[in-house]
Curated annotation (Swiss-Prot):
GO molecular function, one term: DNA binding
GO biological process annotation, one example: regulation of DNA-templated transcription
Superkingdom to which the source organism belongs: Bacteria
Name assigned to this protein: Probable transcriptional regulatory protein CLK_2466
Lineage: Bacteria, Bacillati, Bacillota, Clostridia, Eubacteriales
Main location: cytoplasm
Keyword Transcription regulation: yes
Amino acid sequence: MSGHSKWHNIQAKKGKVDAKRGKIFTKIGKEIVVAVKQGGPSADSNPRLRDVIAKAKANNMPNDTIERSIKKASGELNAVDYETITYEGYGPAGIAVLVDVLTDNKNRSAGNVRYAFTKQGGNMGSTGCVSFMFQSKGQIVIEKKDGLDEDELMMMALDAGAEDFESEDEVYVVATSQEDFGTVREALEAEGLEFLEAEIKMVPDTYTAIDEDTATKFQKMLDVLEDDDDVQNVYHNAEFPEGWEE
């Protein structure tokens, strides 16, 4: 299919630091709290909660941890009120960057995000300065395994309403519209498939190739952002050099 998700080249870097430092469950737990407060504790009637639970399971979050987060948001346990904010700006060499945060202190979050930008030669911008370069898309990532036929999986995904299907080195990447994400995910789940990733994310219209020096600076910026407990997601349009390792 046309287009490239660049999941391993770019998106695999997102989450690597989280997993390494044990932060991913905390961040998903906050997403669950927000989803429950907005739409209630039943995944059957709360599409956003269904999506977050799918993301949690794709990240191997234990069921009891998921349930505890739901109870916390339902008022059965003490819950914090979080505010959702998206910061926009430019990384080194003008890389377009979106930073989603869930925070109980927006002044703290704004200061931390601004520091991450400026430390590596970037700068925060005004609302709308780069968001027009991205589209909200569903992305489902499936690990390649023996017995999983690529053509069958592609037809399964496209028949369910997927927009695109990519085969990469170790994974298949299914892209959907935001509206069809839940339908496609549920259709693939019904076939017994497990996901490495299943979530709505901001995907750039085009990618910008960067050199190794810029990649090193930008990865440092990503590390600082992703190590912040308030930061939920970081999206960008940088294409790292082939074979580059931090």
